[in-house]
Design a protein with these regions (language model features):
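Metal-dependent amide/peptide-bond hydrolase catalytic core
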Residues: 1, 42, 161-165, 172, ...
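Acidic/His- and Gly-rich active-site-bordering loop/insert found
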Residues: 1-91, 114-118
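Glycine-/small-residue-rich active-site loops that bind phosphorylated ligands and cofactors
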Residues: 16-18, 90, 97, 129-132
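Beta-strand secondary-structure signal
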Residues: 50, 122, 179-183
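Short, solvent-exposed loop/turn segments at the edges of secondary structure
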Residues: 78, 151, 175-179
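Glycine/serine-rich anion-binding loops at beta->alpha junctions
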Residues: 88-104
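Acidic/histidine-rich catalytic neighborhood of metal-dependent amide-processing enzymes
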Residues: 99-173
Length: 183
């Protein structure tokens, strides 16, 4: 399976927050094939996946597999989970935030000779970032990693950031969201 096919397969999984719905089942074998050890760290109805390879300072890719609800499907110009390619663009719920980032990082790892790695590389994914984010990465998993002397030293989050166009901005320490209604 190539990068595009994998991304489409991941996007077709209807992982509406806080449910993973099988995304980790798709991702985990790919990581194991690269030599990563993996661990599911679940709290209540939230699934989390932690994978690592190597030793030393820990560089972690942080992400989430959940997506926000689609809203009325008839408001979409296409099926939000079809992940169809039109004019070289994959359109699907989660394409920008953030299943494509997960695919890109995973496939970048396939191009690295991990046997020459001098640090620990880890991946930490949660199924509950778009919702209340309880029982996921920040609230529980990072605490568990610290308690096991497995702190993260460096982190890359594949969250989209932008001012004018998707991906035109890199941000440091951004977390959270705001939702509301105007009446």
């Amino acid at each position: 399976m190539n990068l595009i096919e994998f991304t489409q397969k991941l996007l077709r999984i209807q992982s509406i927050t806080p449910r993973d719905m099988g995304c980790f089942d798709l991702i985990e074998p790919e990581l194991k094939e690269l030599g990563f050890s993996t661990k599911r760290i679940n709290y209540l109805n939230v699934e989390n996946l932690y994978a690592e390879i190597g030793s030393g300072e820990n560089f972690c890719f942080l992400g989430h597999t959940d997506v926000v609800p689609t809203g009325p499907v008839e408001s979409w110009s296409c099926d939000p989970f079809a992940a169809e390619i039109k004019e070289n663009v994959i359109t699907a719920r989660g394409a920008a935030d953030m299943k494509s980032s997960i695919s890109a990082f995973l496939f970048a790892l396939k191009d690295i000779d991990l046997s020459k790695n001098r640090k620990k590389i880890s991946i930490l994914l949660t199924s509950n970032e778009e919702g209340d984010a309880k029982d996921g990465t920040i609230e529980k998993v990072l605490d568990e990693l610290k308690q096991n002397n497995n702190a993260i030293n460096y982190c890359l989050a594949g969250e989209p950031s932008s001012k004018n166009e998707l991906g035109d901005t890199v941000r440091i320490g951004r977390r959270g969201s705001l939702s509301g209604s105007l009446t």
